[in-house]
Regions:
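Juxtamembrane/disordered regions of integral membrane proteins
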Residues: 1-280
Length: 280
C-alpha cells in the first residue's frame, strides 16, 4: 500500500513537471504569429478562467491520461519499463507533432497556408511532444517494478504488423476524405486539397505506426492488445483535438465529432484486420 501511494505521488509530480515544461517550451519556441492568436480566444471557459489556466488544465488532463495508460494498463507488461516509456513517448510525440500540421487556417493566426503556418504549427507540436517524451521516460524509470528491467520485446516489423498498420491508416484516411467531401469535418480541403490529402495520409501513417508500437506493451491476446492500443490513442487524440473547442466559442462539439469520427474510421480498419485473422 505504501508503494502504491508512493507511485501515485511520483506520477502526479511527473505530470505537474511535464505541464510546466510544456508551458515553458511553448513560451520559448514561439512560431510566427504567436503575438496575435490569443486575441481570438473567446470561449466561455477562457473568459472565465483566463487562457493560461485553461491551457494548464488541458495539459494536466493530457498528461494524466498518459500516466493512467502507463501506470495502470501497461503495469503488468512483459516489456521493460524503459522500452514502454520509449514506445509511448515517441508514439504520442509523433501524433502531436503531425497532428498540429492539419490544414485548418481558422484555428491559426494565418490567412494562407505556407512556411509560416508550418513553422508555427511545428513549434506548437514540439511544445506538446517534447514534454510527453520526458514524461513517459520519467514514469517508466520511476513507477515500474525494477524486476522488469531486463525484459525486452524488441521491435518486430512483420507482414501482419504491416497489414495492421495499413488497415488502421487507411481507416483514418478514408474517414477524413469522406468527412472533407461531405462537410461534416471542418477543413480547408477546398482551398488546399493537395496539402490536406498529404496531411491525412501522413497522419494515418502516424496512427498506424503508433498502434504497432504500443499494442505489444499490453498483456493478453493480439485482439485485446490492438483494441487497448487503439482506445488509448483515440482517447488521447480526442482530448488533443478538444483544445481548440476549449479556447474557441462554438467549436467544442465539432472538435469532439472530429475525434470520434477518426476513432470510428480506425476501428473499422481494426475490425477488417481481425476479420482476416492476422496476428502481430
Amino acid at each position: 500500500m505504501k508503494n502504491k501511494w508512493k507511485r501515485i505521488l511520483i506520477g502526479i509530480l511527473c505530470v505537474i513537471f511535464a505541464t510546466i515544461i510544456a508551458i515553458l517550451v511553448h513560451a520559448l519556441m514561439p512560431g510566427p504569429g504567436t503575438e496575435v492568436i490569443e486575441d481570438d480566444f473567446d470561449s466561455k471557459l477562457v473568459l472565465a478562467l483566463g487562457f493560461p489556466v485553461v491551457a494548464s488544465l488541458y495539459f494536466v488532463v493530457l498528461y494524466l491520461q498518459m500516466w493512467g495508460f502507463m501506470g495502470i494498463l501497461a503495469r503488468k507488461s512483459k516489456l521493460s519499463g524503459p522500452e514502454i516509456g520509449f514506445r509511448f513517448g515517441i508514439s504520442f510525440a509523433a501524433i502531436y507533432i503531425v497532428g498540429m500540421q492539419e490544414v485548418i487556417l481558422s484555428s491559426s493566426p494565418f490567412t494562407e497556408y505556407g512556411k509560416d503556418f508550418f513553422l508555427y504549427q511545428l513549434s506548437m507540436g514540439l511544445g506538446d511532444g517534447i514534454p510527453v517524451v520526458l514524461l513517459c521516460l520519467a514514469l517508466s524509470a520511476l513507477c515500474f517494478p525494477k524486476e522488469n528491467i531486463k525484459k525486452t520485446g524488441g521491435l518486430r516489423i512483420t507482414r501482419d504488423a504491416i497489414v495492421y498498420m495499413l488497415c488502421v491508416s487507411c481507416g483514418f484516411f478514408t474517414q477524413r476524405i469522406i468527412g472533407y467531401i461531405f462537410g461534416y469535418i471542418d477543413s480547408d480541403f477546398k482551398s488546399y486539397p493537395l496539402e490536406t490529402i498529404l496531411w491525412a495520409l501522413t497522419m494515418g501513417a502516424t496512427f498506424g505506426i503508433a498502434n504497432i508500437l504500443i499494442s505489444p506493451v499490453f498483456c493478453g491476446n493480439v485482439a485485446k492488445q490492438r483494441m487497448l492500443s487503439l482506445l488509448i490513442i483515440s482517447i488521447n487524440w480526442i482530448w488533443f483535438n478538444l483544445f481548440i473547442g476549449l479556447i474557441y466559442e462554438g467549436l467544442f462539439l465539432s472538435m469532439l465529432l472530429r475525434g470520434l469520427c477518426d476513432f470510428t474510421g480506425m476501428l473499422i480498419g481494426l475490425f477488417i484486420v481481425q476479420r482476416k485473422g492476422t496476428e502481430l
